[in-house]
Every structure is written in structure tokens, then in C-alpha cells.
Amino acid sequence: AAILKSKADTLNKEQFSALHYTAPGTDLTLGLPKNHVWESAGAINAQGESFLPNMPTEEVFTAPDFRRAEGYVTSTKPLSYNGNIIEGIKVTFESGEIVDITAEKGDQVMKDLVFKNKGARALGECALVPDPSPISQSGITFFNTLFDENASNHLAIGAAYATSVEGGAEFTEEELEAAGLNRSDVHVDFMIGSSQMDIDGIREDRSEEHTS
């Protein structure tokens, strides 16, 4: 948990303007909101005590600016959603919006998810997971997102967490949307990471730094 917190702290200091993901089948640029917050596993309860709500955990995560996604991304692991196993997902974005989504298996399920749910044509989370992570090294697909998301970098279709921007927990729905946080009734993670993926942070001055 300390290593993850250190990674989150470093990213929070950087305040990258965007992230650029490249890998076979992926070339995606995601804008990040101003004053975005990278979070790690640790949480603090009402008594001020630290605890880990998710075990195991390997991720640091924030929300992308839902209005700023350009390019395409391909999944690297199966997704279990609503009793369906979905494989080979490819998503194409223009101006933040999903304009096309296909899957080698479960194609219609993904199309229905994206095009029939409010706010599901945009992203609500981007999470960085080291490769290899202990879950990925196990070689096991658990078909349970809380486990499988710790195997690789992932994105989430749908709602962003309010805490992904400074002060967001106190924001109204309208203020969250104005800050770039997607509002939706769904939140579905899908895994995109691999040993072949590179992620570069892009600063406001367009300079870049390798992040993962």
C-alpha cells in the first residue's frame, strides 16, 4: 500500500494534462481534469483509521476528463459482465465519446451497455497497474472484476468517482460534470494492459514523461 501511495503522490504532483496509451491495437489519448486526484487502495474511515477496502489491490486510479478521449483501445483480458463473458473488445473515441464498440465475443452485450445506458458513451476511470502484477503472474482469470482489475491497466465505462477531483465529494452533480467527471448509472471496468503497453504523461506544455 505504501508503494501505491507513493506512485499516487508522484502523479498528483505532476498533474499531467493527458495520458497517451500505446500498445498493439491501442493508440488512445485521455485528457485529465484540472485538479484531478490519483487515489490508491488506502481509505480512511469516519474514526480516522486507515484501512484497505479492496483486497488484493495493485492499482492507482483517477477519472479522465470525459470530454477529452481520442483514438482507440483494445482489451487484453476477458470481461465478466451481467453473466456474460466478453472478449476482444475494441472501443473507438472521438471528442470523448464512444463512437464505435465491438467485441469478438459478446458484441451485442457491449453495444447495449454503451448505447442504452445514460452516460455510458464516455469513460469514468483510468487505473494504472504494474505489469507484471501478482494477479497477472498467477495466469488466472477470475471472472470477478475486483480481482481481475488488479491484473492490468484498466478503464471504466460510465460513472466517475466524485473523489477523483479535489473537493469533488462536496460538488453537486452539475459541478462534477463541469469539472469533467462523467455521470452515469453504470461503471464497468475492462482490462487493457499488457507488457507491451506504454503510457506517457503529457504536460500542459506538451512535454511528455513515461509513467507506466
Where in this protein do the model-derived segments appear?
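Conserved small/polar residues in nucleotide/adenosyl-binding loops
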Residues: 209-211
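Active-site lining segments that contact anionic ligands and/or coordinate catalytic metals
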Residues: 68-70, 86-88, 95-98, 121-125, ...
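Internal helix-turn-beta structural module
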Residues: 139-207
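Long, well-ordered mid-to-C-terminal structural blocks that present hydrophobic/aromatic surfaces
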Residues: 62-118
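Short solvent-exposed loop/turn micro-motifs enriched in small/polar/acidic residues
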Residues: 12-14, 82-84, 119, 148, ...
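Active-site bordering "gate/hinge" segments
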Residues: 1-70
